[in-house]
Amino acid sequence: MKILVINGPNLNLLGNREPETYGRTTLATIEAELRRQASQAGVEIEFFQSNHEGALIDCLHAARGRVDAAVINPGALGHYSIALRDALAAVDYPAVEVHLSNIYRREEFRHHTVTAAVVAGQISGFGPLSYRLGLEAAIELARRRREAPPDGGSNG
């Protein structure tokens, strides 16, 4: 089983950018924790980060037929990128959307994500724990899909 973890714009600056909102944990630290979690679960994990919408879409497309599920933090793109939303809708694997901050306790424009309607679920507001919970959910979704009957059982 393989899980893809995708991070969007500005997440490469975690630990330095707005620490009062996003905390001081770096993306490298989050990735190391997810590697440990995946290893303990016997799951392969792959990471990708880009500040460019097209690169994120290309990554989602390239993962078709290669991964069993994804965890995505689209960053600000989640609020307005119809192209990213459509890419998530087009892939053949479930995705879990995560956000470090509670987007519903922030500015009004952050209360809605266009991507939420096409992912299996959304986790926000738990800091780095959002990623660990997202990975746990992605693993469970992938397991359910593998165990589903071939005649159209639910994929999560």
UniProtKB/Swiss-Prot annotation:
Entries under Gene3D superfamilies matching the protein: Dehydroquinase, class II (3.40.50.9100)
Single GO molecular function: 3-dehydroquinate dehydratase activity
Enzyme class, broadest EC rank: lyase
CDD domains: DHQase_II
Swiss-Prot/TrEMBL GO biological process terms: amino acid biosynthetic process; aromatic amino acid family biosynthetic process; chorismate biosynthetic process; quinate catabolic process
Entry annotated with the keyword Nuclease: no
Sites annotated Transition state stabilizer: 17
Domain of life: Bacteria
E.C. designation(s): 4.2.1.10
Keyword field contains Amino-acid biosynthesis: yes
NCBIfam families, A to Z: aroQ, PRK05395.1-2, PRK05395.1-3, PRK05395.1-4
Assembly behavior: Homododecamer.
Family recorded in the similarity comment: Belongs to the type-II 3-dehydroquinase family.
Job of this protein: Catalyzes a trans-dehydration via an enolate intermediate.
Name assigned to this protein: 3-dehydroquinate dehydratase
Species for this entry: Moorella thermoacetica (strain ATCC 39073 / JCM 9320)
